[in-house]
Amino acid sequence: MKQDVILVLDCGATNVRAIAVDRQGKIVARASTANASDIAAENSAWHQWSLDAILQRFADCCRSLSSALSECVVRGITVTTFGVDGALVDAQGKLLYPVISWKCPRTAAVMETIERFISPRQLQTLSGVGAFSFNTLYKLVWLKENHPRLLEQAHCWLFISSLINHRLTGEFTTDITMAGTSQLLDIHQRDFSPEILQATGLARRLFPRIVEAGAPIGTLQTDAARLLGLPAGVPVISAEHDTQFALFGAGAQQGEPVLSSGTWEILMVRSGQVDTSLLSQYPGSTCELDSQSGLYNPGMQWLASGVLEWVRKLLWTPETPWQTLIDEARAIPAGAEGVRMQCDLLACQNAGWQGVTLNTTRGHFYRAALEGLTAQLQRNLRTLEKIGHFNATELLLVGGGSRNALWNQIKANQLDIPIKVLDDAETTVAGAAMFGWYGVGEFSSPEQARAQVNYQYRYFWPQTEPEIIEGV
């Protein structure tokens, strides 16, 4: 008997993947290939995406899974991507201009001068989204100022997930959580902001019908089916922006903060209310729409493991095993014997260590970095509680940084709440599959789909004794 699966097509900045997931959230088959942006012909410093190349990479992944998928029934397809990027298209869906990558510097000047149209504070109060140079708003203003005829000719703007969905189904749609990254929405109305559009001279007609996560978009058309090596007629279900599905797929409940710990740490929460007027007071803050209507995802981000990588390179070597650093830091008592580190190496003139003596070792420096980053997390969590109107009782931790058990224990001790570590790295894929199963009618809600998954967490509890390395 063939196994029913949802096929998740995940377009990341570095990899394109096709992953088949069963009803219990288990991965049945997966394939991956490298993804990369292209250099723009207009300027060698500019970056753009080739939609055709991305579709071909999906095709390569799907065809490499043909043997495994022959034993499955693909019940539905979902697409997840990074946010903000997209393109203007004509009535046939043909790109009028290449997809400007979030890595492209051309829109930085637009961000710096956006006050010509609307104050940055009002912009964030309305949209929730922080001032990041890659925001969709700045791309559209750049196109308006540099290629005005294209906006006049355009049938619509499609975010990158919707560009892919259009190639699959022929439907023109706007994925709601992608729009939530754009800085174009009135986040409280869950629709495009008349005030922002009017101020910047952008037409509402550019944005086609909004679809919620889990909603059917259409069915896989013959040409796309042939390209992917799949049967035509498979339902395509809206899944959208990767961040929101990572939160849901990690098992996060409303009011439970999630820390994605990597080179950057991104702290977000699924909140029923948010005070967006506070956001502009805090650099690095943002708020996006949750995958479920009525919820918001306020968040903050800061450089984290990037600091630790710098410390390793400075005091050890880039190849030194992390366990060597951890063992040396674990031998140092909490408080690092008075050595403290201000960890904002990007923006703070006072960044670096204080309290250094002739007895200070590199273990002190690394431990002080771990404690300094945790103090930064503590401040940001308190800020997020204020913005999102919640009180954290535990912190859910995902990402590469969660493998550092000493750091996890320091977090539990300094925050004085349990740290809950999810080892499964495929949270985005899991979340997208849950909405896919809901969208094809297998479950009555995404939550019911999520209830089928057996989550395995490791806990780090606050303690006053020397750090343990094994979670309970």
From Swiss-Prot:
The gene is fucK. It comes from Salmonella typhi. Its cofactor is a divalent metal cation. Pathway: Carbohydrate degradation; L-fucose degradation; L-lactaldehyde and glycerone phosphate from L-fucose: step 2/3. It catalyses: L-fuculose + ATP = L-fuculose 1-phosphate + ADP + H(+). Belongs to the FGGY kinase family. Gene3D superfamilies: 3.30.420.40. GO terms for biological process: L-fucose catabolic process. NCBIfam families: fuculo_kin_coli. The keyword Coiled coil does not apply. Catalyzes the phosphorylation of L-fuculose. This is L-fuculokinase. The keyword Nucleotide-binding applies. GO terms for molecular function: ATP binding; L-fuculokinase activity. Keywords: ATP-binding, Carbohydrate metabolism, Fucose metabolism, Kinase, Nucleotide-binding, Transferase. Its EC number is 2.7.1.51. HAMAP family: Fuculokinase.
